[in-house]
Every structure is written in C-alpha cells, then in structure tokens.
Amino acid sequence: MADIKNFLYAWCGKKKLTPNYEIRAAGNKNRQKFMCEVRIDGFNYIGMGNSTNKKDAQTNSARDFVNYLVRVGEMRSDEVPSLGAELGDSIDGASLKSEGFSGPTGGPLPPHLSLQAESSGAAPMRSNTGFNPPAYGGGAQWERGANLKDYYAKREEQEAQATLESEEVDLNAGLHGNWTLENAKARLNQFFQKEKTQGEYKYSQVGPDHNRSFIAEMTLYVKQLGRKIIAREHGSNKKLAAQSCALSIVRQLYHLSVIEPYSGLTKKKEGESVEPYQVNLNPDIVKQLQSTIQELGIELPYPPEDPSQPVSLNLGKLVHFEPSQKQSHSGVVPWSPPQENWNPWTSSNIDEGPLAFATQEQISLELKNEHMYHIQDPNIKQVLIDRESLPVKKFEEEIMHAVHNSPVVIIRGATGCGKTTQVPQYILDEYIRNDRAAQCNIVVTQPRRISAVSVAERVAFERGEEIGKSCGYSVRFESVLPRPHASMLFCTVGVLLRKLESGIRGISHVIVDEIHERDINTDFLLVVLRDVIQAFPEIRVILMSATIDTSMFCEYFFNCPIIEVFGRTFPVQEYYLEDCIQMTQFIPPPRDKKKKDKDEEGGDDEETNCNLVCGDDYGPETRRSMSQLSEKETPLELIEALLKYIETLNVPGAVLVFLPGWNLIYAMQKHLEMNPHFGSHSYCILPLHSQIPRDEQRKVFDPVPDGIIKVILSTNIAETSITINDVVYVIDSCKQKVKLFTSHNNMTNYATVWASKTNLEQRKGRAGRVRPGFCFHLCSKARFDKLETHLTPEIFRTPLHEVALSIKLLRLGGIGHFLSKAIEPPPLDAVIEAEHTLRELDALDSNDELTPLGRILAKLPIEPRLGKMMIIGCIFYVGDALCTISAATCFPEPFISEGRRLGYVHRNFAGNRFSDHVALLSVFQAWDDARMGGEDAETRFCEHKRLNMATLRMTWEAKVQLKDILVNAGFPEECLMNQVFNNTGPDNNLDVVISLLAFGVYPNVCYHKEKRKILTTEGRNALIHKSSVNCPFSNQDLKYPSPFFVFSEKIRTRAISAKGMTMVSPLQLLLFASKKVMSDGEFIHLDDWIKLSMAHEESACITALRAALEALVVEVTKEPEILSQLDPVNEKMLNMIRVISKPSTAGISLVMGNSRFGDGPRPPKMARFDSGFQGNRGRGYHGGYNSGGGFRGAGNRGFRGSRGGSGPRGGYQGGGFRGNYRGGNQGGGFRGGYQSQGGYQSQGGGGYGGNFQGRGGFRGGF
C-alpha cells in the first residue's frame, strides 16, 4: 500500500491536478497521533487518514481518496494497487410470519368495571412504500428555506449600520436596521397596504393560567422574493407576542432588502434612573495603571472638550486573527462505506492486530461462522421466539425491501412495537447471512442518554453478548464502543454531531430514532443527512417516529417511502380529570390561604379555568371537587388517591407517573415516603430524570417481587425514549417544562406548560405492555380539547450560537444558507444575531470562517461566551473554577430546599461574597473533599448539607470533560489545577474569577435598589430570584457593599427575576461587563444606563486593559503553550487586572454593617493537610499528568513546581498544590490527583484516573 500516494499523484498529474495534504497533530499527550486530510480541486470530498507517524497518515488519507474515486466511477478498482473489494448489491429479503394482536377498547368504564369486560381484537395494518427517486445529484431545494444571496451581498453595509446601544427590549436593534418593538408593527402594516396583501397572526398559548405565554405565528408570501418567510415569537400577552412576531417579519424583510432601515429617532422608554456611583482610586494604583498602559504602547482617547459631545473609551480590537481562506462552496460531511483497516467508532485507521491486514471477505466469513454457531444456543433460541412475537416482525421483509431500494425510509411505529431494538438487528443479521458482514456498520441515534444506553444493553442481551461486541453505546461522559466491523452503535444525537468532524466514514446505515421530538440537534442532523444523501446515494438513512403525522418528513426527504407498523401489544383505556375524581371520590384538601407575594404574582389577569367546565354526566360532588382544583398546580393528593385506587384493583403492574420537572418529582417522592402507607415495603418508589446517575436510572427496568407496587416518577424522558415493560398504569400530569428564549431582550422564560396532544398520546402508549392498560390524564376534557397538537420545535426557541459554530466546524458553508435548508428554518433575524455574536466574540474572522478561538469554542459543549470565559480563566490560572461554574450551568442547582428561599445551611456557602456562583464553587469544593472519604462520607455530607449528590456528580463529569478538551487543545495542565478559595476573607484568585464571570454572563447586569427590587438594563424593574443566596427573608431593607450585580439568567414568570446573582464592583463592570463606554469628562456612562463618577484617564486606562487582554487571547488561542512563559509586559497587564478586580480597589469592604440575615457563624474549614500518602483514599503525592503543581500568589504569577520532577507534584485532575490565599500568604496543603481513586469507582462509575485512558479514553462529545 506504500505506493498508493504515488499512484494518486500520477492520476492527478494526468488531469493537471495536485493533491493537497494537510497534516495536524491529534490525540492526547499520552498517545500522539497525526491526522492527514487530502483535498483535490473539483471533488467535494476530503480523504482522511491517521496514524502514529505522518507518513502512514498520508498513505491512509490517499487510500481513502482513491476508494472514493473508485466509488464514483472516476477510476477502476483493478487499476488500484491492492485495493479491497467494493460493496456488493443484493440483499435478500427474509420470509416473515404474521401474528394477530390486540386492538382498542370501547368507552371510559372505570378500571374496576372494565377489568370485568376485557376483550381483544385485531388492529389494522397498512403501509405506504411508494417512492419517487429524486435526482440526488441535483441539490434539491427545500422550499421553506430562505434565499440569502441578497443578504450576504449587503453584509458590509449592514455591519457599518450596526450600533452598540443597549435597550431594554431591543438589545440588538442596530444590527437589524434599527427596527424595534415600537416601530415594526406600523411598518409591517404599511407593507401590507402597499403590497395589497394581509398577514394573519395565528395565536396559540402555552403554560398554565398563572404563567401563560402566547405564541404568535405568521407566514407571509413576499412577491419580490418569490417565497415565504415565517416568524414565530412568544410574549406574556397577545399584544407583546404579535409585536415580537411583527418585529421578526420586519427584520427579515430588511435583511432581504425588501424594506429600508428605520430612519427616524429610536424612542427609548425612560426607565428608572441609577444614581451616579463615586469611584476613587488609590494614587499608587493610578500610577501602576498608567505605567502598564505605557508599556503596552496603547494610546488613550483624549477627554471631551464639550460634555455634550462625549467620547468613546472603547479602543476596538488591537489584534485581529488572520482571515482564513473563504470556503468557496457549501460543504457536505464526507461519507464512505465500511472499509478494511478503518474503525468508524474511533475514526482511525487500524494499525495493529489481525484486522489491520484482513480483507472484508475474511472478516465476513469469520463473523458469519461465529453468528451461525451462536444462534444454536438454547437461550438465544428462546430470545428469538420472544423477538418474533413483536409487532414489527411482521414488517421485516417490507422494511428490508424498502431499505435496499431507497436511500431514505421512514418507519412509523406505535410505542412498544419493537422498531428501535429490532430494525438495526434485521439489517445487521441480513448482511451477516449474505457473507457481507464487514460491509455493515449501523449508528442509531437516541434523543437521550438513558435511552441510548438501555437500548444498547437490551440489544446486547437479545444477541447473547456482552456490551462492546456487535453492540455498543456512546453518550456524554461514557462509551463502550463495539467492534470495528458488523456492529451497531447507539448514541445520543450530540455524540454523532461531534463525530461528524471526521465524517460519516465506515458507516453503512444511519438510523435516527424519535425524529418527532424536534430537538435542535435532531433538526440539525436531518439537514446534514439530507445533503449527504444527495452527494452519496449509496448511504442508507432510516428515520423512525412515533405514530404521528410524518408527511412533513416524507416531503423533506424527497417523498421517501413510509412503512407503518401497528401493534400496541394491548389496548389502553384513558380517563380525564373528572373521571379520576369520580372513580376515587376525591375531595381536595383545603386551599392554602397563605398570601403570595404580590410582586411574584404580578397581577391577577386570570384566564379561563377549565376545571370549572364539567359535563352533566358527572355528579355534583365531582363537579364541586373539580372546581376546587387549580390548573396552576399539579394535584399531588389526587395522584396519591389514584395510587390507592390502583392498589384496590389487584392487577399487578408498575405505575408510571409523568411530572414536569425534578422539583415536583422530588416533592412527590417525599410526599409519598412520609405517608406510612406508601413508605412501607409494599411500594417501591423510583425517580427517573436525565440528571440522576445511570445506576439509579437502571432501577426502573428491574422487576419487583410479587406483592410490591413499583411507582416510577418521571419527566417526559419516559415518554418515547425508553420502554419499561411492566407498566400497566400511567398517571399523566399533562404538563412539561420548556425553555423559551427571546433574543431581542435576552429573556429566558422557563415555563411549566401544558403538553401537546401528541405528548399525551405518547404517554398513554407507555401502558399496556403486558396486559390491557389504563391512563389517567390529570387535565379535564375541556382542557384537552384546547391543547396544541404539537409543541414549538426547539430551533424556534433557543439561541443558535452553538449550532452556528458546529456548522463552521464541519465546513458546511454559510451559517444562514445551511440553516435555510432546515425542515422548518429559523427566522433570518435569529441567524444574523448568532453570526453577529460569534464575530463579536472573535470566533469568526472577516471571511466568516472559524478563528483558532472559534475552533476551540466549537469543540466545547457549552455556550460560546462561557467557553471564552474559561479560556481567559486559563490565562489567569483559574481555569478549574470557571470550568466548574460553566459545568454547573448545565444542571439544576444542587441545593435541596422545600421552601422557595434558601436556608442558612446553603447561604453560608457564599461566605461574604454575596454570590450564588461562589456558593456553587464552595459547595463543589466541600463535596469534593467529603467524597474522598468514600461513598458513605459523600452521602452523609450531602444529607447533612441538603445537597443533591447526583447533580454534584454530573457537574464533576462535565467539568472534567471541559478541562480535557482544553488540555487537548494545548492549554498547560497547570492553568487548570484545582484551587481552594477563601469565601470569607481576601482572595485575589476569587476576585479574578468573579471578574471573568461578569464577562461570561454579560449583558446580564443589574443594580440593587431596595429589598428584592433590582434594575436591569436601561433601568427596567426586576426582582432577585427567590432561589438566590441574596434574596432577603423578609421585608428588611438590606444595603449590599456594592449595589452592582451580574446574573446568569433573566427569568419571566408573572414578574421578571434575575437568577444566579453575584455582587461585583463598578471597576469589574467597567473592565468586563460593558460594551459601550462613554466619557463626558465628569461621568463615565456604561451602556447608556450606569453612571460612574471617576476620572476620564483612569477609566480609559481600565477600558484599555480589556483591549490588551483580548489581544492576548488572540495569541494564546493560536498557541496555548505560550501561557507557560508569558512575556513580562503581558504578565504586568494580567497583574494589573488582578489588582483592579479586588473589591478594595473600588473602595468596597466585603463586611456588611448589619448582621447579614442572621446567618450565624460560618461552618468550620475542612482540613487541608489530610492528603499525603493516603493509599486508602486513592490520592497522595502523585499527579494526574506527571505535571508540576506549584502554587500561585495573589498578585504575581508565583512559581510552579518542577515539571515531571520528584517531590510533591500536584495533579491536573486532582488538585495540585491547593494553596489558600490569606492576606498575601499561601496556606493550606497538598492535594494530589485522583489516579488511584479513579473518580467514582466505588459507585460503579469509573473515572479518568489521572490520564485520559482511565475509562476508555476521552470520548469528546455530548
């Protein structure tokens, strides 16, 4: 094979082409590999190869490209030196047996009566396999997509028009021609009059009455463009929703050059004004500042001569990334069929062992012999009999015929029909029987981790194998990969998207399950696959969905065939709220008359309560009880009554209870456990949530002994993703939690909303697996009739920054162009905002290609601004803390609190920093210490401090993953070592963490007025969220040391509240949390609403420090290793930022005058000198990466331990020298790595164990 490179070169020479090879280092520091990509002009394919040396990597990439040229008919396989056989064509269908199964039942008899009248019948079957093969090479256009050429032609002109002003309801109006909520609707009406057309708003609503959101949607045909544009926006009332929808339409018309920019004066609603804040800097600090700026060679803006003509202090970018070559065409993710010497699951060539040299024929023969021997096992024969009883078995021949003849097939199957576990096995077994095993590798995506793992384990069981043979899984934090040939990988969509960077190489079939869920990752994957199918028609894509309308998917994929699989095993009878009340004779407990905070409720605009509507068929007691129940709340007592009623039926079977979120699951679990009836041994109550550990999740599948009732309390995770076989009863709250994000005001609305009719149908389908089932919907029939058919797809209600980065990382062309091909494209204004944000962060260069910074951000599974915050944290050697804070944003708070406000036990974790983020950091560090004493010590600590252990463990996993990605990107391990922070005394490292946090959460800045009241951007009113450590217990009027705070999210319920708050100094805002800084000579104006009374030159120097730091970020992301030896000028600049970050520099003392909420004494410090030579705890003096730990001083870098030498060396994973800054001196003790402990081994989780191979290597992805 050594001459394959020369062969390709000679072939290119004849065509006057040149192959271009690009080699880069890959892998981690323990096992260096090289990746080579080869491109040839005129071919939309990238040949890829990797190996432990550059020469073999080049050879492997050349061979991959030659294989591609053979597949597309550019050369013959017999011309190629030692090239393996190509894919064959035939798949023989298998004959199938048909069996009957039960059908639906009649009217709503109560279960105790319907049990006496059980019956079963046959359900009809039908299929639709008509398929019109498209012209796959023709790049078929999806008509919903936008034509963006006019927009991109105008890019530079729009950039010039963009303003940096920050408004409360329109933070980014300047980006969109200055069209705002106030002026857009009038302009849209003018457009309608001129065009003699009319757009109609279609309204829908989500959420219960007390927290309702309205959605306004409009589809408008634009004659000038010859196409439709769509907007879908939400607001707290119809008027606001319609205004937001009109704004989206007008902004899209502007970007498509149909209407002009707004030329009038933008009216700003006057918010409440913020008093100027006096800042006096120490003269010594002023001298240091001036000296630093002088050494950096930065020229400062002169003071204004006229206060009415303020000058900008923003210096812009001092250093730019060099623009990379603009991508000339829309890329397609490369695909190749399974080949010899290639492992698709690790995306690497097989350099060692027999598989490195075996041909496909040899591999196929060996696997067939093994398979034929295996199926003779009596246990396997019994499993085969069970598999044949599944409804999908009757459709095997039809499915295989469609898969063979069509690149795309949709399989629509009822819950529990067996499609998820059986279809991949049908395909694989067909290939094995036909001597083509080595030509088959199947990837199956699932929307959630639990489903990917549980389905993989089920399939492995059915095949009589250990997981990791023909079947494996890969989810975030954990992978068990299957063999390289004739195998199935079950993974989350996020994991597959991460793998796409290496292409879909060596995979014959992609199965996307649960396409109806419409999460943003699945929608993204469908666009990728649609393009891949057109470029490579040989690939096979199977889309699987529940029994919902799939016509949109069918149309999107070129009118592909749909196979409908019927057969819910047993019928399910459903009941509504009035039925449940009548059959249980339920009487609600007296309403809690405790008055709610008026500011929390924000008014009493109650809508119709459907619980007041009850049919005449029901008795007066039922109607009275129903009217006393509020639709706002989930009736836990009624669920309890239903469980007791179910017990009287004496029909064995598990009960699955659907609840909208973890808080209610926890509340319901505690409610039942406190009741002696349910707390006894006759009940087994199990929570099921995506955030609990997998070992806990697995328990829901385990059978229980006779006489015990299993009750599973679950979110919608159990709706479609997993099947629990013994469920007979479903109790459905009919609600779910969704996150609605509005970009123009940076507002997040976490709403518990009514689920859709489709959701309810899926939930009902979870019952009736082992016998006729029962479903109790806790909504009235009147409410059911009002439910939406489907919920809004996630792509319409989430920021697009992360998706945009993925598009650029995968080289798929322009962000807007790619997203316009989505099954339901997001509005153009949302796309432009994502692009603008990424350019502002320096993630995209002037050609809209990824910068080195953008490439790192694209690989971090975190919001891009937080990713950049972590990178700056590495520059200051506080990377670990910022990785912890970023990881914590992915999960709920770890605090368990029955009341709305946090208790003292939780508030104490914030020390005197007035910070939810510091509290999180302190909790995490205290837990990290406690768990070193073993699982019992960890459990005791969490129970004593009322913390959710599962959340803390997941945060640890996420933090380690983020740190691994940064280390793989080249950042020194020393800048990511654990540190101990002092939250009650001076700690300059903690000051820096808070400064960088202000950068990470910008533009979320607020000013404390009184009690719970705060002002956000432009002086708009909001409240401190009740879950904050800063939320007062009563009406006492607190004065914080600084009135300025930054916060993680703005939440809208009936009032707007700020969640995740941290107190900052005005200098930290000036340095990191302001976009527009203006000086009028007397005051410094931050983002047009905060006024600081400070000298012009001092503020200009501080603003210049940020520009200098941004310039350093450019250099560091090009070559992260330079952090080990920074030049003195940058060292001085970083030390100056450390000084500015100190609260005392701004004249702020962290000790409050009055006793803070009566917190009592702070908890005792955990001992720090407990780590040396502790073999029993699995830590000690050895470091995780053989890297020196050292410690860092408060002001200066300090010194680091010898790299790789002897003596006490800290570990990157485990902590290094965990010094504790107190008044300028280092205290504390050594804290070693986790090498021998290996993470959570005693909990069955494994760990990274000091290097990336500790648990199967770094698995890079979601």
From Swiss-Prot:
UniProt-listed GO biological process terms: alternative mRNA splicing, via spliceosome; chromatin organization; DNA replication; DNA-templated transcription termination; miRNA-mediated post-transcriptional gene silencing; mRNA transport; positive regulation of cytoplasmic translation; positive regulation of DNA repair
CDD domains from the UniProt entry: DEXHc_DHX9 (cd17972), DSRM_DHX9_rpt1 (cd19854), DSRM_DHX9_rpt2 (cd19855), SF2_C_RHA (cd18791)
InterPro entries, per the entry: DEAD-box_helicase_OB_fold, DEAD/DEAH_box_helicase_dom, DHX9_DEXHc, DHX9_DSRM_1, DHX9_DSRM_2, DNA/RNA_helicase_DEAH_CS, dsRBD_dom, HA2_WH
Region (OB-fold): 960-1076
Motif (Nuclear localization signal (NLS1)): 588-597
Renumbered residue ranges of the record's region Core helicase: 400-811
Domain annotation Helicase ATP-binding: ranges: 400-566
Pfam families: DEAD (PF00270), dsrm (PF00035), HA2_C (PF21010), HA2_N (PF04408), Helicase_C (PF00271), OB_NTP_bind (PF07717)
Ranges for region HA2: 833-921
Binding site for Mn(2+): 420, 514
GO cellular component: actin cytoskeleton; centrosome; CRD-mediated mRNA stability complex; cytoplasm; cytoplasmic ribonucleoprotein granule; nuclear body; nuclear stress granule; nucleolus
Sequence segments annotated as region (siRNA-binding): 5-9, 53-55, 185-189, 237-239
Region annotated MTAD, chain positions: 334-382
Principal location class: nucleus
Cell compartments where the protein resides: Nucleus; Nucleus, Nucleoplasm; Nucleus, Nucleolus; Cytoplasm
Assembly behavior: Component of the coding region determinant (CRD)-mediated complex. Identified in mRNP granule complexes containing untranslated mRNAs. Associates with the RISC complex. Associates with the SMN complex. Associates with polysomes.
Function: Multifunctional ATP-dependent nucleic acid helicase that unwinds DNA and RNA in a 3' to 5' direction and that plays important roles in many processes, such as DNA replication, transcriptional activation, post-transcriptional RNA regulation, mRNA translation and RNA-mediated gene silencing. Requires a 3'-single-stranded tail as entry site for acid nuclei unwinding activities as well as the binding and hydrolyzing of any of the four ribo- or deoxyribo-nucleotide triphosphates (NTPs). Binds to DNA, RNA and small interfering siRNA.
Protein name, per record: ATP-dependent RNA helicase A protein
